[in-house]
A protein has these predicted regions:
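Active-site proximal loops enriched in glycine and acidic residues that flank catalytic Cys/His/Asp
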Residues: 173-175, 207, 245-246, 266-269, ...
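Glycine-rich phosphate-binding active-site loops on the catalytic face of alpha/beta enzymes
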Residues: 261-280
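Short, contiguous acidic/charged loop-to-helix segments that flank catalytic cores in large enzymes
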Residues: 216-222, 324-326, 331-334
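Single conserved hydrophobic/aromatic residue that forms the stacking wall/gate
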Residues: 1-13
């Protein structure tokens, strides 16, 4: 299923692989730590490459968001969205985690990925180190701004040293934390400059923490609402910057790039809604795109309740093998009762 989903969407970032067991999202979560784990990864990268696409592996340590009793963080202090209180990492464990990111990156290259994305936003472990709110350490990884950002910079440097020059190192920065005690805009810009100096090839941008009370992706949030925060990062660096969050239409994406606010645009939910989004855009068929309505009901709501993500306007999402593109030899007529998103999506499909 994962292979078919990625094959259809081609250029993509495969998310949420932890470099160490305690960094998983939940019990039984995804970890890439050993060469013997590469078989399933090679199957996916081969499928994407054969379809003409490219795939990057996202390395994510969940930190205090990990729904496991062994969760860890820069400092003790429970997240509002997790029942488990974290244990503060020792200095030695911080360095071991840096090594874990480097090791997973090297394995990702062996598996056929063209790069890795280091997840440093949305309130996960790396983001927790950069914010005074969640970092009350008194060693070399906490205290003032320089020490709070040392952990991610050491990760970028270690990853860059472990992989080939052609292998992409993408850093996903929190362009705006939307949390009291988070980084200021000036700090974000300076941090981005140092991420570039540490060896990152590209910066992706995240918006807000998962526990923030500020909506970032719901339907009432205007399209490209956070572009000023992304532009702040773009102005600070010379490497490509990727925009994200509430960008679900080709004209919006093109306007962002044309304005110079970003060099490229990443989308997640719009590709759940329509895996042909990029092809339809390229072929000037934007009017045929099955647009994400930002309802979050079948994707994020399901993910955060430990269920498989799908899409309210695309019943094939997450069921690519069950509902393939083959045509029946005995077509039938159906009457669809109900004109809401689900009914219309069913009728179209």
């Amino acid at each position: 299923l994962h292979k078919e989903y990625r094959r259809q969407r081609q250029m993509c970032i495969r998310d949420s692989y932890s470099p160490v067991p305690e960094g998983v999202m939940d019990e039984g979560g995804l970890v890439l730590q050993k060469p013997e784990d590469l078989g399933e990864h090679r199957a996916i990268t081969s499928a994407v490459n054969e379809a003409g696409g490219r795939i990057v592996l996202q390395i994510l340590h969940a930190g205090r968001y990990a729904k496991v009793s062994t969760c860890v963080a820069p400092s003790a202090g429970k997240a509002r969205i997790n029942v488990f209180p974290p244990r503060a990492l020792t200095t030695e464990e911080v360095w071991a985690t840096v090594e874990g990111f480097a090791n997973t990156s090297a394995l990702a290259e062996q598996a056929g990925y063209v790069g890795v994305e280091i997840m440093g936003s949305e309130g996960y472990l790396i983001n927790e180190f950069t914010a005074a709110l969640t970092n009350q350490r008194d060693d070399e990884f906490g205290g003032d701004f320089d020490r709070r950002i040392r952990f991610p910079l050491e990760i970028v440097k270690a990853v860059r040293a472990r992989v080939s020059p052609e292998f992409m190192v993408i850093y996903r920065i929190s362009s705006i934390d939307l949390m009291d005690g988070g980084m200021t805009g000036e700090e974000v810009a300076e941090f981005a400059r140092r991420v570039e100096a540490a060896g990152a090839d590209m910066i992706n941008t995240g918006i807000g923490w998962h526990e923030s009370s500020v909506p970032t992706m719901a339907a009432p949030v205007p399209r490209a609402a956070w572009i000023d925060a992304i532009r702040n990062v773009k102005r600070a660096v010379g490497i490509p910057v990727m925009a994200s969050n509430r960008i679900n239409a080709p004209d919006v994406a093109e306007e962002i790039i044309a304005s110079g606010a970003a060099d490229l645009v990443s989308m997640a939910r719009p590709l759940l809604a329509d895996p042909e989004f990029a092809r339809k855009t390229r072929e000037n068929r934007a009017d045929e795109i099955n647009t994400c309505i930002a309802c979050n009901q079948a994707c994020l709501d399901r993910i955060f309740t430990d269920r498989v993500a799908t899409c309210l306007v695309n019943p094939r999402a997450g069921r690519e093998i069950e509902f393939d593109d083959s045509k029946t030899t005995a077509p039938k007529h159906f009457a669809v009762v109900g004109g809401g998103p689900a009914g219309m999506a069913f009728a179209i499909n």
